Design a protein with these regions (language model features):
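Catalytic nucleophile serine of serine hydrolases
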Residues: 67
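Patatin-like phospholipase
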Residues: 1-62, 75-356
C-alpha cells in the first residue's frame, strides 16, 4: 500500500519543508495528543523519529504532551529512548483486567505499567536528559471534580460538557492547567492564555506523579493527590484541558513536529462530538504526520485501537492483541514511508497545507 501517511503543515512549517525538507535542527518541539490506545498506530513513528530526530541532537527539544503522549514522551526521554518506548509498549499490551474492573483495579494496573518502564532508578535519566525537555500537561480538578465518587464526578463532567458547547474557555471553570516542565528550560514557546496555568518544575520526586496524573481518566481511574504550596490538589488526565495540543506557539523559524493518529486536531476532551469545533490557535509552525484514511480503512475493524477495545475484547485478550499487533505492523509501514520521504527529499512534494 502506498501513500499511507498524510503530512500537513502550517504556513511557516510548509514554507520551510518546501524549501529544505525536514531537518533535525529545525525541530524545536514535538507534540503529542491524548487518546489512550490510539497511540498504537504511532509506535513505529515514535521509534523512527527518535532515531532520526531525537538521538544525538546538539540543541534541545521540548516534548510536550498530555495523557498517553506524556507516557510515550517519558519513555522516549530515557537515556535509551528506543529501549524505553519498547518496554512501555510491551507492558502496555500486556495489561489485563477482570470482566468488570473498577477504578481501583485499573489504577493499580496503570501504576504497574508505569513501574515497568520507569522505575525510580531511571527517573534521573529524564530529569537530566542532555537535550530532551519533557513538558507534562495535567488538569487540576475544581469543585465537584475534586471528589472520586461516581455521583460528584458524573455531575461535574456533565456540567463541563454542557458549558463547553457554548465556549471551550468555560472548561476553566472546572479545571486548571498544571504544566510540569523541565526545570532547566522554561517552555517559553507556549504562550498559554486560556485557563489558569500553574507551572511546576519537574524533579525526581514529582515526575512519576505527573506522568501518572496526566493519564488518570476521571471515572475510570483515581485522581492523583499532589501536594503543592502547602495545599492538596487532585490532578487528572491532561487531555481534559489540552486533548490534541491546539497550542499557542510563539512564531519563529522552527518546526513543531506532531506525530498524530488523526488528520484532525480536536482542541479539548469535550470537543470530540463537536464536529464544528476547530483549533483556536495558529498552526503555522506545526508539521503533523498521521495515517491516511485509506490506511486506517485497511485495518480489520476499519479503525485504530481505542479504549472501547477493553470492553469489546473483555475476557479475550488474544483477539485484542491480534488487532493491536496488526495496527503496529501498519504503523511500521507508515513510519517507513515517512522516513523514505524525508531521506529522499520527496517530503517537499507530499506535504500539504493544513485543512482548517
Amino acid at each position: 500500500m502506498k501513500n499511507i501517511c498524510t503530512i500537513q503543515a502550517g504556513e511557516k512549517a510548509y514554507a520551510i519543508i518546501k524549501d529544505e525538507g525536514l531537518q533535525k535542527e529545525r525541530i524545536k518541539c514535538m507534540l503529542g495528543a491524548a487518546g489512550g490506545p490510539k497511540w498504537i498506530i504511532l509506535y513505529g513513528l515514535d521509534k523512527v523519529l527518535y532515531k532520526a530526530f531525537l538521538k544525538k541532537r546538539k540543541n534541545s527539544v521540548y516534548m510536550i504532551g498530555s495523557s498517553i503522549a506524556t507516557w510515550r514522551f517519558a519513555a522516549l526521554s530515557l537515556a535509551d529512548g528506543l529501549q524505553g518506548i519498547e518496554a512501555f509498549k510491551e507492558r502496555y499490551f500486556a495489561q489485563q483486567y477482570s470482566m468488570q474492573p473498577d477504578r481501583h483495579e485499573i489504577t493499580a494496573e496503570t501504576v504497574a505499567i508505569l513501574e515497568a518502564f520507569l522505575p525510580d532508578s531511571k527517573v534521573d535519566e529524564i530529569v537530566k536528559h542532555p537535550t530532551q525537555r519533557l513538558c507534562i500537561i495535567t488538569a487540576r480538578s475544581r469543585h465537584l471534580l475534586q471528589y472520586d465518587n461516581t455521583f460528584s464526578l458524573g455531575v461535574g463532567l456533565g456540567i463541563n460538557a454542557v458549558t463547553n458547547i457554548f465556549s471551550r474557555k468555560l472548561v476553566g471553570l472546572h479545571f486548571d492547567r498544571y504544566a510540569f516542565y523541565d526545570a532547566r528550560e522554561f517552555p517559553s514557546l507556549i504562550q498559554w492564555k486560556s485557563y489558569h496555568t500553574q507551572y511546576i518544575p519537574l524533579n525526581n520526586n514529582n515526575l512519576k506523579t505527573a506522568v501518572l496524573a496526566s493519564g488518570s481518566i476521571p471515572l475510570v481511574m483515581n485522581g492523583v493527590v499532589f501536594q503543592h504550596d502547602g495545599k492538596t490538589h487532585i490532578l487528572r488526565d491532561g487531555g481534559l484541558v489540552d486533548y490534541q495540543q491546539d497550542l499557542p506557539l510563539e512564531p519563529g523559524d522552527y518546526i513543531a513536529l506532531y506525530p498524530h493518529y488523526s488528520d484532525r486536531i480536536i482542541p479539548g476532551w469535550f470537543d470530540k462530538p463537536l464536529k464544528y469545533r476547530k483549533p483556536y490557535h495558529a498552526l503555522e509552525n506545526v508539521c503533523m504526520v498521521s495515517p491516511s484514511k485509506e490506511a486506517i480503512a485497511s485495518l480489520r475493524y476499519k479503525k485504530i485501537p481505542d479504549r472501547k477495545d477493553f470492553y469489546t475484547f473483555a475476557g479475550d485478550d488474544s483477539r485484542r492483541l491480534l488487532f493491536w499487533n496488526e495496527t503496529v505492523a501498519l504503523g511500521q509501514q507508515i513510519a517507513e514511508e515517512f522516513m523514505e520521504l524525508v531521506e529522499s527529499g520527496r517530503i517537499k512534494d507530499r506535504v500539504i497545507p493544513f485543512k482548517r
